[in-house]
């Protein structure tokens, strides 16, 4: 029998709430004990709740609930769980190169790897156990950022040995996801329609006036100044001029959209609640709602494997999907 964590849908929903500051301290449902313990090795961990996925060279690395870290060397067909020194919920993972990677999550946890995700060590000092980190980004093996709830924004220039708190001058909004564009710009999406843009590697940030006041869960940078942002209640907006002006898209549904991806062939796919996907073949000018038959679970993120397939992570763990 497949063993699933109890109330999987509820845990998935709590991550949504984490990114919209509706749970406050209830989100830190773990404790110092859970943070300090090693993750339990579960034979079917790839079927548990997973919240983010990244590429590590030719491999894929996914992270999620109970400190689970999974590595796939065959494009997401099979997964191997890596030992992790925490049982906290992990919400973000990033690899600037095939060997160096970081994952972050609840209870102020920051983990690092130098072998492509096979082994991990703690980098946080345990003093921020009440922090909820939601995403991580690294330019290279030395310079990176961690962002999260209540305006948490940490920076490092020594590979995570030390972290410095910064404030991009917006207040204590929840920062949900940080993304790099093809021109080197950084995009930081958050609650209250927040989209911050940096053109200097993250030292300074400018707020884009997005005509939407709900939470944004991500930004998908395109070529030549194009950006797509997405979030609550099916909201999708597109800019052609680095965020100066925005055009909303009618998604025909009110589902929450959590992840976005542009494939090598140019197809854009956004994924969210209930197995709802939004596809665009014209650089985000128009979207078509698509529901894969038999796929009814919620998606937190998605990535293109080297063989051109799409691997999703979310409520049902890691799942390869076949696009129409």
Task: List each model region and its residues.
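Residue-level hotspots at or immediately adjacent to binding/recognition sites across diverse folds
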Residues: 2, 33-324
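Bacterial N-terminal signal peptides that target proteins for export
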Residues: 4-21
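Bacterial N-terminal signal peptides
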Residues: 18-30
